[in-house]
Amino acid sequence: SSAASDVYKRQIQKRLVKAFPNIETEKDAEQEEKFAEGCGFFKLASLFIIGAFIGDIVETIFCLITTGRLMSRSSLVFGQFSIVWGIACALLTWILYRYRDKSNWFIFLFGTILGGAYEYICSVFTEIAFGTVFWDYSKIPFNLGGRINLLYCFFWGFAAVIWMKAVYPFLSRQIERLPKKAGRIICSLLLVVLTADMALSFAALARYGERQEGKEGNGVIAEKLDEYFPDQFIEKRYENLKIAK
């Protein structure tokens, strides 16, 4: 019977541990060497980095197909990374991880609401922080202040289902295959580089907004930002950028 089989297996395991006491220690050590297990900091950080890169590439290809033009979709002044997509991947995973076994309809509805709220907040933040608008859905039906629209909210819902049911499980397995020490070093270094890039991009965009208001730069930092990130550079890097009215 099944019960007798389980008892028999436990007896064998106890005898093996007694005969070879290092078995359990080696098993625990092997488990400890697993990088970014579960849904902790390093898993979310890895998903942020991967999501930022893949999101930028996908959006670039999408724009090329729909507009016939190759334009930059990066959030940063250096590198091809979309911070909006990176944060979305990490945030979506963190919130929906506990519901990953729920039905597709549940994930879709949750993702639709969550994605719409996230995009709206991002739009408000960029307008307040930089005085700029990166997207405007005013010409699309069922929009809310041009910041979000119903169709794109549904896209967020579909993306949530695909992400939680297919993409996330695959990426999670690949991430966990990295050696623990090497994985933490690589992930930490990439986070430091991206953080520095984000800080520089934030400063460059803020200074761009000041220039549009006719404000003179004061200090060495403002002078360097004007020199290395002039209007021509910013407007080419962020082609959809508009000054908020």
Sequence positions of predicted segments:
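Short, small-residue-biased leader/transition segments that mark boundaries at the very start
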Residues: 2-8
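Cytosolic juxtamembrane amphipathic/interface segments immediately preceding
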Residues: 26-40
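Interfacial segments of alpha-helical transmembrane regions
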Residues: 43-49, 101-117, 182-189
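Functional transmembrane or membrane-interface alpha-helices that line membrane-embedded catalytic
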Residues: 45, 67-105, 112, 126-165, ...
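Transmembrane alpha-helix/helix-exit interface in multi-pass inner-membrane proteins
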Residues: 56, 60-63, 116-129
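Cytosolic-side transmembrane helix boundary signature
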Residues: 158-187
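Internal/C-terminal transmembrane anchor helices
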Residues: 180-204
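Membrane-interface segments at or immediately adjacent to transmembrane helices
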Residues: 206-245
